Amino acid sequence: IFPRLLERKEQQARTLSGGERRMLALGRGLMTRADLLLIDEPSLGLAPVLVDEVYDRIAAIASSGVTVLLVEENFAHVREVADRVVLIENGAVVLEGTVDDVLNNAAVTATYLGVGVDE
């Protein structure tokens, strides 16, 4: 599921790096044939070089028709795979819409994304 892991298919999981073990765990979940996939912060603890690989796979799964519910704090990653975004603060929905809806909302981008904030 991840080319980087295929290169290490003969290794035992305990010999993989922490990020590779996280990718292995994520890969096991991604291999299910579910209609809905819930993924909680898949890039957490991954080296930057591994993050792109993970999000490429998530995007491929989403484009295959699987509904992906993704919890992620890094909006740059969300932009890559999301059709819709829900911002939640303290359990309450702050904004729901397309990625463009969120990015075009000046108050939301200033508060949550740190964009357009006057210093």
Per-range role (PLM):
Residues 96-97:
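ABC ATPase "signature
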Residues 29-30:
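ABC ATPase C-loop
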Residues 52-64:
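Helical segment within the ABC ATPase nucleotide-binding domain
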Residues 26:
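Hydrophobic anchor residue at the start of the ABC signature
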Residues 78-80:
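A short, surface-exposed alpha-helical micro-motif characterized by mixed small hydrophobic
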Residues 12-16:
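Conserved ABC ATPase signature
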Residues 37-41:
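Catalytic Walker B motif of ABC-type/P-loop ATPase nucleotide-binding domains
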